[in-house]
Amino acid sequence: MSSVEDLFDKLNADLAPGQEKRLNFDDIKLKGENLPGEPVDFSHGDVDAFEPVPGALENFNYGFNEIGGTQAYTVYRGREDILDDVAKKLSDYSSTSIDPENELIITPGTQGALFLAVGATITRGDKVAIIEPDYYANRKLVHFFQGELYPVQLDYLNHEDKAGIDLEKLENSFKDGVSTFIFSNPNNPSGVVYSKEEITEIAELVRKYDVNVIVDELYSRQLFDGRTYTHLASLDIIPKENIVTIIG
């Protein structure tokens, strides 16, 4: 049995996300001239600093000075008025119906949401399918909760109109007893977007084998070149108790 220290060691990372397999400059040939200006760190999703939205400071001061109680501890799932507002906006955005009382939890960031979702669905010895490549923390969290990994390859370099998931291998993993499937859409780090056909086939397989699925849709707003996006929950194929959607 692993100690608490051993488990938390599995979450450690010496480098920032996206830098765990950095190339040595001796291994690549740099082409072109140096570009002017400040360097941009592309190892994270936030590549720029954004000022607060208009009215943010005024509303914060109003809540702090006039209401007061908004700065006290709140219920763990989030304040009711915020849940109602977020549920409405997410329902409109994702083309699905979200019950704010029973189907929505507000967390301090999507990493916290991912930790809660994995911890709620995986226990020691559970078989878990993940995509390779995908968000680096997926693998770490499965190890932390002592699950057994089943990697499924994403052939994203050879497709332009889809992500390139190996659906046959995914189904075989379900046949072998995988109980939870974790993936991000758009894929992090490649940025490819799953086609509607791929998302539909994933949903059909999840329902057929009664698998839990955790889908990270954090970057679903960052679509380019006329790409279309299909929210997994919007297909209404998977029972709601079998799907967790993470979005920010």
For each predicted feature, which ranges?
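Walker B catalytic acidic pair
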Residues: E217
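Residue-level marker for buried hydrophobic side chains located in beta-strands
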Residues: V213-I214
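Conserved core of the PLP fold type I
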Residues: G69-L205, S220-T245
